[in-house]
A protein has these predicted regions:
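Polytopic transmembrane helical bundles with strong interfacial aromatic enrichment
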Residues: 1-119
Length: 119
């Protein structure tokens, strides 16, 4: 999770800069907002993955394994679909965005449950 979290964080910074400096002139304001949401949620969950990666060394791996894998899938589906929608021509991918959001929420809830179960 440390590796994927680090990669997601780097991509978030790269995409944020790309959006601010290159896409600002190319996308509508609505498309830019969607692109920024995708970038923001990717960054938030990169921190989550980094936390899960570090906690994997402190706690048992089973506490972070399922939530971490779900978080990776959630970021790819949620942010990935928003990137495609914002860049135009891929509006149908917007239908899967809520699935990615539900997977992200569920990853945090499973993590909370695993922590609760351990204590």
């Amino acid at each position: 999770f440390l590796l994927v979290g680090s990669i997601f964080a780097a991509l978030s910074i790269l995409f944020g800069a790309f959006g601010a400096h290159f896409l600002k002139e190319k996308l509508s304001s609505d498309q830019l907002v969607v692109f920024e949401i995708a970038t923001r949620y990717m960054m938030y969950h990169s921190f989550g993955l980094l936390i899960f990666g570090l906690l994997g060394y402190i706690l048992t791996e089973e506490i972070v394994s399922a939530p971490g894998m779900m978080m990776i899938v959630g970021v790819v589906v949620f942010s990935g679909s928003l990137y495609l929608v914002s860049l135009g021509g891929f509006k149908k991918f917007g239908m899967i965005t809520p699935i990615g959001g539900v997977v992200l929420i569920t990853s945090w809830l499973i993590f909370a449950y695993n922590i609760y179960k351990q204590s």
